[in-house]
Amino acid sequence: MQYKDENGVNEPSRRRLLKGIGALAGSCPVAHAQKTQSAPGTLSPDARNEKQPFYGEHQAGILTPQQAAMMLVAFDVLASDKADLERLFRLLTQRFAFLSQGGAAPETPNPRLPPLDSGILGGYIAPDNLTITLSVGHSLFDERFGLAPQMPKKLQKMTRFPNDSLDAALCHGDVLLQICANTQDTVNHALRDIIKHTPDLLSVRWKREGFISDHAARSKGKETPINLLGFKDGTANPDSQNDKLMQKVVWVTADQQEPAWTIGGSYQAVRLIQFRVEFWDRTPLKEQQTIFGRDKQTGAPLGMQHEHDVPDYASDPEGKVIALDSHIRLANPRTAESESSLMLRRGYSYSLGVTNSGQLDMGLLFVCYQHDLEKGFLTVQKRLNGEALEEYVKPIGGGYFFSLPGVKDANDYLGRALLQV
């Protein structure tokens, strides 16, 4: 029996096809002595047991090599006073510590009561390389909790840039969680757990889920993720393994004259950027590469051979090789002045179905960390205003936040230095 596909081409029946596959498999020798390996696109058996340290000077999820799955969730805080806010931060610390290190799922002693765990990971909650990074927004420092004098000096409410089309429902938040793991199941489980434990303290404001390719995640930072415009995203990132450089670029330090509690934290800029992918896919390759300033396949700056080659703008003052308004040239002109605007990018792609106009709703969850929001993201974005890429991208949400310093030990909790001032 045969079937026809949508083009009228005859296809063999499923039974005959499977029989043929079985015969082919039977004729192939099997190397039983070889070590079993994970198939491409799947995680190794040990990946579920990967874990990141929870205690330390800084929160995990900032310098951590990017995991495959990610979620941004902004919340409004429902706490009634400062004591309630402390209860929230202590509770979040406890949940983050357990979820990131793994353990047996709690049993429900009375079946007449709701289960203590969602159960979506089964009886054992594997760490799965989970990190949950807590950041606070400008609005947390209003009159509710008496924290205004302790607000980080550069923290501010995100305002509109010329190309923005911001949706108020997708902006800002008292707190923001960046949840990352090897698999989306673990990310979803973590969110469910946190919401279950904080019904009187937190209310979800907005949420977006992101991803990078599994092979990029498995490279542990050695392979640059590719965004949904088909270009490598994050090539020019500073080396996150260079502690001295991270002190200069990412972490707030004592010499910045910030409130003392902020030392060890970082300013976080979040932008939800929608791509016009159908329009982009109809754009000639040469124009795409001119807009970015890079070769689409290799990621190399135009006129160069390798992804991490450093462009020499001094030898191309008129932009004949790399256009003056190209993305990479505007974002980082590589001058002495632009050294102060370095930041660590940690972006993810998103795909949400279709818009009301029938266009694919795809884009970028842009996240970056820096020790100074004004010198970092804000300065870079001002340079990018009017770039050629704006025709294909539209920022629709996000916000500016401050990622809290880390938790020193089991007696400490996130935000303790802020709340005990």
From Swiss-Prot:
Locations listed in the record? Periplasm
- One Pfam family, short name: Dyp_perox_C
PTM statement from Swiss-Prot or TrEMBL: Predicted to be exported by the Tat system. The position of the signal peptide cleavage has not been experimentally proven.
- One BP term from GO: iron import into cell
A Gene Ontology CC term for this entry? Answer: periplasmic space
Q: Where is this region: Disordered?
A: 32-51
EC number(s) reported in the record:
4.98.1.1, 1.11.1.-
Report a single Gene Ontology molecular function: heme binding
Which residue positions does the secretion signal occupy? 1-33
Reactions catalysed according to its record:
heme b + 2 H(+) = protoporphyrin IX + Fe(2+)
Q: Where does heme b bind?
A: 234-236, 327, 332-334, 345
Q: How is the cofactor bound?
A: Binds 1 heme b (iron(II)-protoporphyrin IX) group non-covalently per subunit.
**Cofactor(s) required for function per UniProt:** heme b
* Superkingdom classification of source: Bacteria
Swiss-Prot/TrEMBL keywords: Heme, Iron, Lyase, Metal-binding, Oxidoreductase, Periplasm, Peroxidase, Repeat, Signal
Q: What's the main place this protein lives?
A: periplasm
Q: How does it assemble?
A: Homodimer. Part of a ferrous iron transporter composed of EfeU, EfeO and EfeB.
What the protein does comes down to: Involved in the recovery of exogenous heme iron. Extracts iron from heme while preserving the protoporphyrin ring intact.
Family in the record: Belongs to the DyP-type peroxidase family. EfeB subfamily.
Protein name (database record)? Deferrochelatase
Its source organism is: Shigella flexneri
The gene designation is efeB
